[in-house]
Amino acid sequence: MKNYEQIKNYAKKCISGEIISCKKHKWACERFLRDAEKFETDPEYPYYWNEEAAQSIVDWFALLRHSKGILAGKPILLTEWQRFRICQLYGWRKKKNGMRRFKKAFTEVARKNAKSQEEAGIALYEISVTATKNREVCEVYTAGVKRDQSKIVFNEADLMLRGSPLRKKFDVTKVMITHTKTGSFIKPLSKEDGKSGDGTNPAALIVDEYHQHPTTEFYDLGLGANTKEPLLMIITTAGVDLTYPCYTMEYTYCSRILDPFSDVEDEEYLVDICEMDTEDYGDLERLGNEELWHKANPIRMTYEDGQDKIRGEYKIAKEIPEHMTAFLTKCLNVWVQAQENGYMDMAKWKACQVDEIPINTKGMSVYVGFDM
């Protein structure tokens, strides 16, 4: 079965509930099916599906190797959830020139769901296949606040090449991975190193764990003006500071892109959010429903060791309130505002929102208090 049909079937299963999914992931599935219908029925629709391009990225990952765990050394076979997003990134094309439809991609999911592996595989693909196809030198940067963070994706790319038949196509040093044929390369950037990206010309920028970035410094680097197929890629987990741009800007904006009742449209931004729904973490009893953990863990909840580790984190969080914030953010991909000895329950916070003030306040005095 072709990737296109597989993705359509997957999307329908998520929407129907056959595959446990959160509201926003269902919205992402609905968005794909709407696009598919336009492609199939509307000759004026500006995008088309390129099955060969979609299969190419699937085959690419199969040539790379798992770097750790019980699958270490084995080919990377993309899961249904990974195909749903990655095949869309490369499969949807512009009719006017055949180039990629999506210039930006945002994925938010709980930890240990192969985020770094995905970013690394795509980075290697960009400096090899995409650079060769477009006959250009592609500069790809992995950006992180800390030095160690910026090198996570870089190091993962190195490890995934070990034992791979693709290894001979690349020159790997401690600071750069170079595709020998095109001269394209991957480099890590970090604020801690004093490398802000000034003077770079990125064809692709991978912002890792954006929830930790206090500013949009790397996000604002911009992509190379002369690049034929630029790509800004963000894969992150929820964080503990609601004033950071990942929450105030990206998560909020991307949620509106997915929301079918929103007037926000961005046809060149691929978005997927896998999180616990607000009604799922309002009380401990529902929070402990392991079936619901699948919503934020489309990969980790599919194998026993992953389930056991989330289960263990939950037991600790129940007994020690100080650990609840970490459990919600890292294991269930829920945004919280961290406080000393606790957390702000965002479900209750959002429940306070009203679209219209229920009483007539005209002429009334208003008093505002601040707890500094």
What is each stretch, according to the model?
Residues 2-370:
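Phosphate/NTP-binding elements of NTP-utilizing enzymes
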